[in-house]
């Protein structure tokens, strides 16, 4: 880290210009000045009357190490000789009211383990990375035309030691990475790892944005974990929260006794949804703090993506009775995305946004917000409501399963089955399914089959892969003992086979963001709650036919219109006995019948399993086969594109 001497910095650069290396100025840096080794402390506190650095090295005496104000706008700095890495410290701030308050360093890269709240001097330089091969391979691929399977997890509750203590960053290399590799996830998405005082905030209410939480080890330990993920071909996405922060006394809240990082106006300062306060995104120093922070995680931790939390809460003011857009936030998000993609054009910037705000994943130079992915919250809500409905009544809400295809190409979407849907009394995915024990597992297999064949990249929260029965318990770990039960083992086997099939099947991801990649065969069979569609890859022969039955009925000799290939093989059936199903499968090769059906040139007759998904792959095309109008067979989209990519 190239530390900048504050006296040499232009006064206005941090306060009035885009300055995205503010971590080089602020914080505690181990340096040598005038041939004396020590630590340079620098902080921004615009309304402080006086500032001191306090810690064990001066017995927390406010009078010993007074800081010098180096800009009129409130940058304070001090070099303290002969103190070293590992010292704990805080800033003692004399407010305009004459009080002295103690604050952790906003730019500290390390902190004490909670419940202690002091910052820790840590030299973040020196980690030797070994991920050049990962970076080289990443640049050769288009994230839009590749398979993407994201495993979302909470670091502290995925797995715990027998005594209930947490695994460290380094220990999780041995525990988590082999598991992720076995399941063929392409990425992990970790809930926030910034320093936070309250375990049950899950990291979303942070105090130390530059400090990887010390619950699990040092910053270098986390770097090692990321490095090892890259070694095994796993991308690392972090949850990141630039909208709001917690009100704990030692944190950013009223940092110098006045609103510093938050809005002054109480109407927009307070965030009643979470009991937090909102960042003042119109203030240049705050923007520099946050955008520098994003780049800091990219540069020093080699992170591959951010899932930007609560974008909807940023885009609109939370004034009671009003829904007015926050132009500060809109401008900030555009500036953020421009800075991130200038740093790494292959980075993943995903918006967690539940609104209908347009052009979220459109580049800023085309008038968009500039993200490259967005969670499809509408799909998630509609599909889960449909699945929770009793099967005999699903025909009355049939449109919940088809509506997503009206807007599927308006943005670059990730389909999230996330932590938000399996907590706070919402039940686990398995327990959302109606019916008896067998029905629940059959319908979860069906849901996953639909999930992996619907356009959009994939995200699943931990535990879903083996059918966690209880909803997520953040103070415990996953119910790993469920593997002792046969149906959970079947579910786990099914999930691993499904994700493997997804990854090796280009039609399921190659044209995720193009209407040419999807065609309904029959979207209107609400009476039987059966949906059939085609997923298409770049090549004509790269096509799959998918049939989903959302009732418990079994249908023999069911006609499905298909493109004119000579034969089809069933390559996956969720009702197979090895997955815990009843065994209503199509074992034999399916010969195409040259009679038009479902607006297709031909059809096959198959067995439709109860609560089942069947995936068919063409085997051989007829030479010169033609449709009724004389044109050659080609899969055409019948869904709506809204002009995005």
Swiss-Prot record:
CDD domains for the chain: AmyAc_Glg_BE, E_set_GBE_prok_N
Active site: 309, 352
Catalytic activity, reaction form: Transfers a segment of a (1->4)-alpha-D-glucan chain to a primary hydroxy group in a similar glucan chain
The protein's Enzyme Commission number: 2.4.1.18
Entries under SMART domains matching the protein: Aamy
UniProt KW keywords: Carbohydrate metabolism, Glycogen biosynthesis, Glycogen metabolism, Glycosyltransferase, Transferase
Biased composition (Polar residues): 636-645
Region (Disordered): 619-645
One MF term in the entry's GO annotations: 1,4-alpha-glucan branching enzyme activity
One GO cellular component term noted in the UniProt record for this chain: cytoplasm
Pathway recorded for this protein: Glycan biosynthesis; glycogen biosynthesis
Gene Ontology biological process terms in this record: glycogen biosynthetic process
Superkingdom of this protein's organism: Bacteria
Subunit-structure text: Monomer.
Family named by the database record: Belongs to the glycosyl hydrolase 13 family. GlgB subfamily.
Function: Catalyzes the formation of the alpha-1,6-glucosidic linkages in glycogen by scission of a 1,4-alpha-linked oligosaccharide from growing alpha-1,4-glucan chains and the subsequent attachment of the oligosaccharide to the alpha-1,6 position.
HAMAP family: GlgB (MF_00685)
Name of the protein in question: 1,4-alpha-glucan branching enzyme GlgB
Record organism: Bacillus cereus (strain ATCC 14579 / DSM 31 / CCUG 7414 / JCM 2152 / NBRC 15305 / NCIMB 9373 / NCTC 2599 / NRRL B-3711)
């Amino acid at each position: 880290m190239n530390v900048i001497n504050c006296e040499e910095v232009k006064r206005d650069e941090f306060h009035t210009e885009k300055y995205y290396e503010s971590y080089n100025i602020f914080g505690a840096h181990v340096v040598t000045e005038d041939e004396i080794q020590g630590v340079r402390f620098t902080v921004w506190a615009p309304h402080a009357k006086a500032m001191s650095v306090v810690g064990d090295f001066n017995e927390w005496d406010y009078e010993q190490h007074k800081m010098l104000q180096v800009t009129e706008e409130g940058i304070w700095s001090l070099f303290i000789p002969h103190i070293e890495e590992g010292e704990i410290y805080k800033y003692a701030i004399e407010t305009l009211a004459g009080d002295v308050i103690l604050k952790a360093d906003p730019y500290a890269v390390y902190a004490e383990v909670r419940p202690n709240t002091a910052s820790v001097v840590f030299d973040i330089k020196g980690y030797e990375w070994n991920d050049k091969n990962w970076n080289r391979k990443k640049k050769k691929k288009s994230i839009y035309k590749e398979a993407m399977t994201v495993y979302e997890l909470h670091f502290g509750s995925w797995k715990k030691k027998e005594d209930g203590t947490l695994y460290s960053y380094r220990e999780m290399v041995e525990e988590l990475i082999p598991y992720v590799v076995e399941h063929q996830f392409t990425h992990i998405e970790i809930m926030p790892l910034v320093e936070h005082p309250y375990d049950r905030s899950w990291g979303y209410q942070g105090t130390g944005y530059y400090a990887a939480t010390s619950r699990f080890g040092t910053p270098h330990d986390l770097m090692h974990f990321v490095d090892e993920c890259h070694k095994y071909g796993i991308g690392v996405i972090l949850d990141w929260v630039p909208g709001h922060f917690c009100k704990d006394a030692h944190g950013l809240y009223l940092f110098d006794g006045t609103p510093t990082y938050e809005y002054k106006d109480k109407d927009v300062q307070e965030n009643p949804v979470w009991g937090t306060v909102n960042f003042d995104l119109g203030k240049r120093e705050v923007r520099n703090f946050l955008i520098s922070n994003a780049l800091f995680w990219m540069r020093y931790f080699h992170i591959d993506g951010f899932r930007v939390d609560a974008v909807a809460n940023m885009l609109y003011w939370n004034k009671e009775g009003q829904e007015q857009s926050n132009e500060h936030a809109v401008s900030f998000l555009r500036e953020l995305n421009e800075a991130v993609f200038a740093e790494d054009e292959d980075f993943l910037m995903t918006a967690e946004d539940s609104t209908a705000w347009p052009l979220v994943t459109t580049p800023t130079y085309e008038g968009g917000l500039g993200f490259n992915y967005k969670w499809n919250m509408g799909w998630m809500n509609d599909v889960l409501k449909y699945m929770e409905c009793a099967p005999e009544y699903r025909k009355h809400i049939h449109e919940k399963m088809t509506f997503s295809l009206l807007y599927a190409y308006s943005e670059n979407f990730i389909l999230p089955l996330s932590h938000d849907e399996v907590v706070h009394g919402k039940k686990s995915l398995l327990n959302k399914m109606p019916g008896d024990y067998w029905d629940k597992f059959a319908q979860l297999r069906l849901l996953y089959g639909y999930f992996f064949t619907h356009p959009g990249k994939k995200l699943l929260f931990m535990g879903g892969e083996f059918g966690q029965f209880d909803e997520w318990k953040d103070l415990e770990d996953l119910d790993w003992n469920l593997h002792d039960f046969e149906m959970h083992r079947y579910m786990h086997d099914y999930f691993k086979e499904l994700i493997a099939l997804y990854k090796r099947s280009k039609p399921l991801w190659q044209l995720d963001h193009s209407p040419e990649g999807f065609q309904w065969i029959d979207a209107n069979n609400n009476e039987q709650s059966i949906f059939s569609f085609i997923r298409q890859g770049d090549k004509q022969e790269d096509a799959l036919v998918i049939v989903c039955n959302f009732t418990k009925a079994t249908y023999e000799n069911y006609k499905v219109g298909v493109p004119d290939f000579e034969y089809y093989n069933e390559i996956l059936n969720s009702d197979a006995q090895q997955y815990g199903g009843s065994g209503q499968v199509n074992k034999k090769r399916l010969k195409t019948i040259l009679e038009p059906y479902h607006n297709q040139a031909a059809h096959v007759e198959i067995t439709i399993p109860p609560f089942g998904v069947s995936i068919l792959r063409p085997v051989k095309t007829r030479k010169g086969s033609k449709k009724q109008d004389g044109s050659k067979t080609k899969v055409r989209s019948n869904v709506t594109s809204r002009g995005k990519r």
